[in-house]
Amino acid sequence: MSILADTEKKMAAALEFFTKEVRSFRTGKANPALVETVTVDVYGTTMRLSDLASISVADTRQLVISPYDANNVSAISKGIIAANLNLQPDVEGSIVRIKIPEPTAEYRNEVIKQLRRKSEEAKVAIRNIRRESNDKLKKDSDLTEDAVKGMEKKIQELTDKFCKQIDKMSKQKEVDLSSI
């Protein structure tokens, strides 16, 4: 695999990781990503909630979790409580309802700080990938100096592209958090 393709693949993976982290921030709107990764102890093992139930949005402030096996309702409820997400599950027969509370101004400010920190960490990861790729490029003696400069320029363009995507996602999430 070429250095450029490898660089783009690694940067895309870093962006995907950041995207998953951003989705997990609670904005006050119901979003299945809030609880998808919650772990639940069932069948003598630990499983992700998304593997045990369908998670749907009932309205802007409520999630409905429908377990594939109704016997897991109480375990799912316990798993959500244990995840410390400040969400209170309501068991109603064979489903679990979660009402998403209105976030306080203090909570929103804290989440925005976390978002900015995660955004910066993601951009640092992208820049580290750029540095590693440039180092590999310089060690590759097969390329001429002009070819190395051209590849470095392309790697920088990739870096800029991915950093802009991170900034765009971060700004959009800040708008979502601020407009609650």
Swiss-Prot record:
Record keyword Cytoplasm present: yes
Disulfide bonds: none
Residue ranges of coiled coil: none
Entry's Gene Ontology molecular function annotations: ribosomal large subunit binding
InterPro entries: Ribosome_recyc_fac (IPR002661), Ribosome_recyc_fac_dom (IPR023584), RRF_sf (IPR036191)
Keywords: Cytoplasm, Protein biosynthesis
GO biological process, one term: translational termination
Compartments where found: Cytoplasm
GO cellular component: cytoplasm
Known role: Responsible for the release of ribosomes from messenger RNA at the termination of protein biosynthesis. May increase the efficiency of translation by recycling ribosomes from one round of translation to another.
Family classification: Belongs to the RRF family.
NCBIfam families linked to this entry: frr (TIGR00496)
Protein name: Ribosome-recycling factor
UniProt source species: Chlamydia abortus (strain DSM 27085 / S26/3)
Gene that encodes it: frr
